[in-house]
Curated annotation (Swiss-Prot):
Modification type 2-(S-cysteinyl)pyruvic acid O-phosphothioketal: residues: 116
HAMAP family the record matches: MurA (MF_00111)
Cell compartments where the protein resides: Cytoplasm
Organism: Streptococcus pyogenes serotype M6 (strain ATCC BAA-946 / MGAS10394)
Molecular function GO labels: UDP-N-acetylglucosamine 1-carboxyvinyltransferase activity
Name under which the protein is recorded: UDP-N-acetylglucosamine 1-carboxyvinyltransferase 2
GO biological process: cell division; cell wall organization; peptidoglycan biosynthetic process; regulation of cell shape; UDP-N-acetylgalactosamine biosynthetic process
Length: 419
C-alpha cells in the first residue's frame, strides 16, 4: 500500500508551475476518437487518469505516443468494441467515451463509470440528451448499450434540467458529427468546455457559444488532425494558492489564468490573503491575520466545488467562525473527520461544514477519501506540527501532476512511500 509521509511545520517558498487541466484532458482524449488523422495535445498533466485513458485508447486500437507533456494519438485504428469494465469503472470521466463513440460509430457498449464517491452524479442528463438525438439505451449486467440502430445520430434541441459540465461536453462531442443542428440550452460555462470546443473546432467542427449557456453545433462529416495546447488547471492553481497562503513565506504560482479563478481569488481577498496578480502568475506573500468567511459553491463562474476542500485547511487558520456550503456534491464533507483527527475545530451540521479558527493542527494518520479531500489533507499535513501519514493516495495521484516533486522543490518534507 502506498502512502504519503509529511513532516510538517516548515514554511514553503519558491516557484511552482501549474500543469495542464485534468478536467479538460479527460474529455479531450476521448474526443480525439472523432478525428480522421493524428491529433497532438501539449501540456498534458502526468496523472494516473491520463494513464488510464491512454490504456483504454490503446485497447480500442489507437496508436499513442506520450513523451514529457506531449501526447500524440492516431485514432484511425480505433474499433467499435465493448469498453473494458475494470478500466472504465475506475475512472469517472470514462463517460466521455459515450459521446465520441456515438459520434463515430453510432453505438457504444461501456461499463458504468467509477471515480470519486461524492454522492449522486447521475448520468441521466447525458442519456436524456443522447435519446433526443436518436440513441436507444439499454443495460446488460454491468454494461450499458447505446445504439442508433444503424441510423446516423441526429441533431436536437436539448435543455439541460440542471447545469452539468459532463453532460454539456458529452452532448457537444456527440453532436459534432451528427446530422443537422444541435442546440444545448442551460449549458455549463466552465473553461474546460471552451477548451474541448476549441479542440473540436480546430479539427473542423462548427461549434458556437461554448462558455455561454447556449451552445450551437452544426454537424460535420469529417474532422481532421490538429495540435492543441491544454489550458492550465485552475483547480491545481487554486490548490497551490491556498497552500501558499496557509504555509508559505513567498510562493509564486506560474502558468495561471486569473480569469478562471476570479471568484476563488475574491474570497481569498475577503479573508485578507495578500497576493499580487501578474500576467500569467500569482505571487502569494507570507500571511498575517486572516478573517473567517462563508463559502458557498456554485456552477462556474461561481466558487468551484473542486476548491472548497483544498481551501478548508487555510480557513482553519482564520480568526472566527465560518461555514462551507457545497451545493454541487452533497458528500464533499469526507475530509472533515480526517481534519478532526489532526485537531481541527470543524464539524458537519445539517449538511454544512462549520469551522472555528484558528485551529492548531498536529500530525496524524489520515485517509484520502477522494481527490480533493486528499489535497486538503496534504495541505493540512504541511501546516501541522509533527508527522502526518496519508493513505489511499491513489485519489491524489489521479489529479495532481508531480505533486511530490513540486512540493519538495518548495521546501516541503514529503515522501511517497511504497509499502
Amino acid at each position: 500500500m502506498r502512502k504519503i509521509i509529511i513532516n510538517g511545520g516548515k514554511a514553503l517558498s519558491g516557484e511552482v508551475a501549474v500543469s495542464g487541466a485534468k478536467n479538460s484532458v479527460v474529455a479531450l482524449i476521448p474526443a480525439i476518437i472523432l478525428a480522421d488523422d493524428i491529433v497532438i495535445l501539449d501540456g498534458v498533466p502526468a496523472i494516473s487518469d491520463v494513464d488510464s485513458l491512454i490504456e483504454i485508447m490503446e485497447l480500442m486500437g489507437a496508436t499513442v505516443n506520450y513523451h514529457g507533456d506531449t501526447l500524440e494519438i492516431d485514432p484511425r485504428g480505433v474499433q467499435d468494441i465493448p469498453m473494458p469494465y475494470g478500466k472504465i469503472n475506475s475512472l469517472r470521466a470514462s463517460y466521455y467515451f459515450y459521446g465520441s463513440l456515438l459520434g463515430r460509430f453510432g453505438q457504444a457498449v461501456v461499463g458504468l463509470p467509477g471515480g470519486c464517491d461524492l454522492g449522486p452524479r447521475p448520468i441521466d442528463l447525458h442519456l436524456k440528451a443522447f435519446e433526443a438525438m436518436g440513441v436507444e439505451v439499454s443495460y446488460e449486467g454491468e454494461n450499458m448499450n447505446l445504439s442508433t440502430n444503424g441510423q446516423k445520430i441526429h441533431g436536437a434541441h436539448i435543455y439541460m434540467d440542471t447545469i452539468s459540465v459532463g453532460a454539456t461536453i458529452n452532448t457537444m462531442v456527440a453532436a459534432t458529427k451528427a446530422q443537422g443542428k444541435t442546440v444545448i440550452e442551460n449549458a455549463a460555462r466552465e473553461p474546460e468546455i471552451i477548451d474541448v470546443a476549441t479542440l473540436l473546432n480546430n479539427m473542423g467542427a462548427h461549434i458556437r457559444g461554448a462558455g455561454t449557456d447556449i451552445i450551437t453545433i452544426q454537424g460535420v462529416q469529417k474532422l481532421h488532425g490538429t495540435r492543441h495546447q491544454v489550458i492550465p488547471d485552475r483547480i491545481e492553481a487554486g490548490t497551490y494558492i491556498a497552500l501558499a497562503a496557509a504555509i508559505g513565506k513567498g510562493v509564486k504560482i506560474t502558468n495561471v489564468l486569473y480569469e478562471h479563478l476570479e471568484s476563488f481569488i475574491a474570497k481569498l481577498e475577503e479573508m485578507g490573503v495578500r497576493m499580487t496578480v501578474e500576467e500569467d502568475a500569482i505571487f502569494v506573500e507570507k500571511q498575517k491575520s486572516l478573517k473567517a468567511i462563508t463559502i458557498k459553491t456554485s456552477p462556474y463562474p461561481g466558487f468551484a466545488t473542486d476548491l472548497q476542500q483544498p481551501l478548508t485547511p487555510l480557513l482553519l487558520k482564520a480568526d472566527g467562525r465560518g461555514t462551507i456550503i457545497d451545493t454541487i456534491y452533497e458528500k464533499r464533507i469526507n475530509h472533515v473527520p480526517e481534519l478532526m483527527r489532526m485537531g481541527a475545530d470543524i464539524s458537519v451540521i445539517g449538511g454544512q461544514i462549520v469551522y472555528q479558527g484558528p485551529s492548531r493542527l498536529t500530525g496524524a494518520q489520515v485517509k484520502a477519501t477522494d481527490l480533493r479531500a486528499g489535497a486538503a489533507l496534504v495541505i493540512a499535513g504541511l501546516m501541522a506540527e509533527g508527522k502526518t501519514e496519508i493513505t489511499n493516495i491513489e485519489f491524489i495521484l489521479r489529479g495532481y501532476a508531480s505533486i511530490i516533486a513540486k512540493l519538495t522543490a518548495l521546501g516541503a518534507d514529503i515522501q511517497l512511500i511504497e509499502d
